[in-house]
Amino acid sequence: MKFSELWLREWVNPAIDSDALANQITMAGLEVDGVEPVAGSFNGVVVGEVVECAQHPNADKLRVTKVNVGGERLLDIVCGAPNCRQGLKVAVATIGAILPGDFKIKAAKLRGEPSEGMLCSFSELGISDDHSGIIELPADAPLGTDIREYLKLDDNTIEISVTPNRADCLGIIGVARDVAVLNKAPLQEPEMAPVTATISDTLPITVEAADACPRYLGRVVKGINVNAPTPLWMKEKLRRCGIRSIDAVVDVTNYVLLELGQPMHAFDKDRIDGGIVVRMAKEGETVVLLDGSEATLNADTLVIADHHKALGIAGIFGGEHSGVNGETQNVLLECAYFNPLSITGRARRHGLHTDASHRYERGVDPALQYKAIERATRLLLDICGGDAGPIIDVSNEATLPKRATITLRRSKLDRLIGHHIADEQVSDILRRLGCEVTEGQDEWKAVAPTWRFDMEIEEDLVEEVVRVYGYNNIPDEPIQAGLIMGTHREADLSLKRVKTMLNDKGYQEVITYSFVDPKVQQLIHPGAEALLLPNPISVEMSAMRLSLWSGLLATVVYNQNRQQNRVRIFETGLRFVPDTQANLGIRQDLMLAGVICGNRYDEHWNLAKETVDFYDLKGDLEAVLDLTGKLGDIQFKAEMNPALHPGQSAAIYLKDERIGFIGVVHPELERKLDLNGRTLVFELEWNKLADRIVPQAREISRFPANRRDIAVVVAENVPAADILSECKKVGVNQVVGVNLFDVYRGKGVAEGYKSLAISLILQDTNRTLEEEEIAATVAKCVEALKERFQASLRD
């Protein structure tokens, strides 16, 4: 929002300069974006009157004038402006005047005629870009008066960024209130006395959508002169706020908008059929707006209509059919309070953003409408003449915003700001802000003013108190906090520890969106039900993820497209699985997932280029699982997953419960996702692993360990993990280690079979094992394998 500093000082005039005022406004939360003078630097320009105006004898486009500037004689000045005429009051740069750009006025001859000055346009004085003609001043402008003084050009425009919660500052009155509070200065409101009705004319007004329009005021003003010129003082105030003067009626409504923050609209009363109806639009209904464009409306759009058609979009844009034009004599002034939710988003839907919609979307003071319509009526009558009828008020108190009582506790105030502000200061600040305050024991009960929608809870009052008290007035104090030993279960395995291990192994952590493309997700989890968002950011982000693989694989593709072929990444996050038994019907599981692809090692002269395989990822995953202390209970079992290669994947089980998957991405899925080369993934349900087994101290055997190797032949479909597990189970008391060190297929082994070479480590903590005992345990293992898996010792 942009406004004139002098206009603000008409409302409140603290004894501080422009820089201090701008800094104060910024510190109050209304960030000042810029302060600029309203005119260029010049002097020697005064009010004059064109007494004579004749055609230049030697130039068709020049005129020779005699100008009275209040001196002893008339000045001869040559002027080329098309609007120069006898009797016009003008801005005259006299000899010796210095204009913007260090341009000095001197006596000269133009085409043979003497010129003792210059009649100035707005652009020549650095006031605006208007160079279409010389400045036309009011007829009562006093001759010889310095133009800077007459037009009050020793002024600045201040532009501020108003946050959405401070809609009350979208008018001079709101900024003035804040400045008055900060400086403990009185607020000097211009007189806005009620206008006495001189005619009885009214217009029927019906509000069918009371929830969207709790208050609608109208007033008939008859017999106006719509072509009456807008006073220069009003034009200047509008210009300094960035508003172009259009006609007197529109200028008045814009003036009230800027002054009070209340949007208004003027209808041509004679073009309204029957009366005003405030209603919701009919689906597909059209209205031609003031800019000539046609808008097709939805049923959730509030409109101002007459008895036959829509006249405009409520709170956003008026319609062409009922707009004021050069022949208008009778107008209906509209001043309403619209519920912000009934306006929000409607302007953007039609590609519009108006000053009215900007304010209505954020909220207008529901108690402001009477003051605004009285102010507009008085200005309109003073400028355009005419007679005003009574105010037509259609209000629904039940749907108007209610002011809640907010309790502010002393303990909360002190705790949040870390500083004690005296009780009387707190009470004074709240009252100066416009609150109705009741003081209690170590608390205040405050009712926020109608213009402050953002004051709803206790924290809002704390913010207001410290804002007005001044952040700079809060002393720097060392932070004081009690040191309390945090409780941490030894069995808790921190994800931070897991992430550190993966980082050490060359993985990089990524964070991907929980919103994924439902089509891609169906490729990874065909047939799985996912939660679809009713209002997604985009179609490609309209489903909640069922696993972390969607985001991770998309990240791999992104990197491969940028010549990053060796990728090792992981992510921790939630998946969202529809579950009727879960709270709100959605189960949220914390997952740990990772992806690798490309070469096993970074390029190096001493290392061969080898592509990662299943066992690279399995080894990394086992290192992570070992942190849980449950690696001995983990099994990798062949199990189908539609996203994984059927021959290079496995389900991960903790005892008898499946906790994840690992494997190579299915070749068909690789093709559809545009993955380049073999890609391997894993995913674990972390909640089932977060409780680690705390290592138990035990005696280290002083007696020698014994290793025995066996090679058994089993069917191809027998998992090696089951063989190792069986050996551990059989030799539970003496077998302390089992390891698979070779797998052989080929000569000497029948087709459909494989040879597994297993080492058994046998040891006792109390004595040295005898050879007979060792042989018996090995034989027991072989017998168990033969019985369960039909295994045989390889010759």
Swiss-Prot record:
Co-factor requirement: Mg(2+)
Catalytic activity line of the entry: tRNA(Phe) + L-phenylalanine + ATP = L-phenylalanyl-tRNA(Phe) + AMP + diphosphate + H(+)
Enzyme Commission identifier(s): 6.1.1.20
Alphabetical keyword list: Aminoacyl-tRNA synthetase, ATP-binding, Cytoplasm, Ligase, Magnesium, Metal-binding, Nucleotide-binding, Protein biosynthesis, RNA-binding, tRNA-binding
Classification lineage: Bacteria, Pseudomonadati, Pseudomonadota, Gammaproteobacteria, Enterobacterales
Family: Belongs to the phenylalanyl-tRNA synthetase beta subunit family. Type 1 subfamily.
Name by which UniProt lists this protein: Phenylalanine--tRNA ligase beta subunit
Domain B5: 401-476
Subunit structure comment from the entry: Tetramer of two alpha and two beta subunits.
